[in-house]
Amino acid sequence: MKTGHFRNKMLTLLTILGLGPVHAEPQQGLLDHDTRRLGSEETVNLKEAYGGKVVLVVNTASRCAYTGQYEGLEALYAKYQDRGLVVLGFPSNDFGGQEPGTEAQIKEFCRLTYSVKFPMFAKTQVKKGAADPFFTGLGETAGRYPKCNFHKYLIGRDGRLVDDYLSRTSPQSDEILNAVEALL
């Protein structure tokens, strides 16, 4: 096991137990960003809409090896939304042009192919150096930015980052399920 990975897992456990934050950087306002809903002109302040909930933020794409994770994300959302979990999807074309469609096309793909009901937002840049302010905050707080689609950031009810997960980590993995359960 990598030292950094072990350290992050131990800090996650301590945070869940209320013994300290995972990341020492200030996190006030991590969710305090306005963003536009996918395929709409409606703007949402994430803190106002989702503050007090457990939030799983995911950068998504329709033509990625991990696109099938939409199914697991929707299942996670359906299972836990009544207990206070929300999954927030942010399509991105940052990695190999794997999200080339318009927002209308992305919205239709998600609805028809995976019956996505969790909130989806405007196409977003997430890579370090070009990321929008929300993903810059997530990347800087976590100490890493997405390097591929379906990178996940888990935020607790207090608005603080609890952990982040590489793209290969399934939304149905024990790692994510246990962390979500502990926060709910």
Regions found by a protein language model. Give the residues of each.
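N-terminal "domain-start" segment that seeds a small globular fold
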Residues: 23-48, 68
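Proline/glycine-enriched tight loop/beta-turn segments at coil->beta junctions
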Residues: 49-54
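Conserved hydrophobic packing residues within short motifs/helices of P-loop NTPase cores
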Residues: 55-58, 88, 153
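Thiol-/selenol-based redox modules, centered on thioredoxin-like
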Residues: 133-136, 140-184
